[in-house]
Amino acid sequence: MRGDKPTIPDIVLEELVLPVNLLSDESIETDDIAESERSPFKIDSTCKHCHCRVRLCCVATDAAIRVFECLLQSEFSFLCLKCSKELLRNGRT
């Protein structure tokens, strides 16, 4: 189209390029990622101070339990109730 005012013969509908619907092939990421299922777990460990058995029960995903397991094998440890009372004086200073 050239000129100040377009006229009907200036518009050729067959040559118009229509934009592609950009959302037609897209999906929301949450549709692709399934909700991770949480399961109950029992974690048996020992007290760092007196070496008695400590059991922790929780609900978590498999991936979270694997991360927690790595922590327990490296630098994370538990205290039993008796040792936590003695060593930490029930949180009092």
Swiss-Prot record:
Cellular compartment(s): Host cytoplasm; Host nucleus
Any single GO BP term: DNA-templated transcription
Record's protein name: Protein E7
Subcellular location, principal: host cell
Stretch list, region E7 terminal domain: 1-39
Motif Nuclear export signal in this chain: 65-73
Pfam families to which the protein is assigned, alphabetical: E7
Subunit structure, interactors included: Homodimer. Homooligomer. Interacts with host RB1; this interaction induces dissociation of RB1-E2F1 complex thereby disrupting RB1 activity. Interacts with host EP300; this interaction represses EP300 transcriptional activity. Interacts with protein E2; this interaction inhibits E7 oncogenic activity. Interacts with host TMEM173/STING; this interaction impairs the ability of TMEM173/STING to sense cytosolic DNA and promote the production of type I interferon (IFN-alpha and IFN-beta).
Keyword list, A-Z: Activator, DNA-binding, Early protein, G1/S host cell cycle checkpoint dysregulation by virus, Host cytoplasm, Host nucleus, Host-virus interaction, Inhibition of host innate immune response by virus, Inhibition of host interferon signaling pathway by virus, Interferon antiviral system evasion, Metal-binding, Modulation of host cell cycle by virus, Oncogene, Transcription, Transcription regulation, Viral immunoevasion, Zinc, Zinc-finger
GO MF term (any one): DNA-binding transcription factor activity
Organism of derivation: Human papillomavirus type 50
Function: Plays a role in viral genome replication by driving entry of quiescent cells into the cell cycle. Stimulation of progression from G1 to S phase allows the virus to efficiently use the cellular DNA replicating machinery to achieve viral genome replication. E7 protein has both transforming and trans-activating activities. Induces the disassembly of the E2F1 transcription factor from RB1, with subsequent transcriptional activation of E2F1-regulated S-phase genes. Interferes with host histone deacetylation mediated by HDAC1 and HDAC2, leading to transcription activation.
Family stated for the protein in its record: Belongs to the papillomaviridae E7 protein family.
Gene assigned in the entry: E7
Ranges annotated as unnamed zinc finger: 47-83
